[in-house]
């Protein structure tokens, strides 16, 4: 792996497409997406996820991936926090969706007037084993609503960003990719990488 190649560690095809669409500034001759002087490639790794804050989880994943791949890596952790629950389920949202489904998520807030939620995306960039992990975080405020739109991308169909009348799932991908929590985090990462 070239030192100018960053491996984005994910097995989620939808997430990979979205990250490439947002992050890429060009395409290299070999068809790889580029941001600044870096080419972006992908690898699926089964990394242990510790319990902790989104920052702790992201740092741990980035260090583990860098140790396995012996080079620059990018990892991501996303959380969805309900204001009524003091920002839980937070980084455990994937397990909540898997256990109780999207309707279960909505039902959790049934008795609460406050349906507010924070979608938080944190990317961790690590240049290699023993290197410091740099974090890039984006937040989008919104509300939890009954599921609308396709249900093939996490909790997108139950999250309606503030100021919009559509859920992430109902939005055109191009529009979503200019306002999402992932976009806000990747915008910071792109600035960092293009200035290296």
UniProtKB/Swiss-Prot annotation:
Cellular localization per UniProt: Cytoplasm; Nucleus
Gene (name only): HAM1
Cofactor details (free text): Binds 1 divalent metal cation per subunit; can use either Mg(2+) or Mn(2+).
HAMAP family associated with the record: HAM1_NTPase (MF_03148)
Name of the molecule in the record: Inosine triphosphate pyrophosphatase
Family statement: Belongs to the HAM1 NTPase family.
Transmembrane spans: none
Enzyme class per UniProt: hydrolase
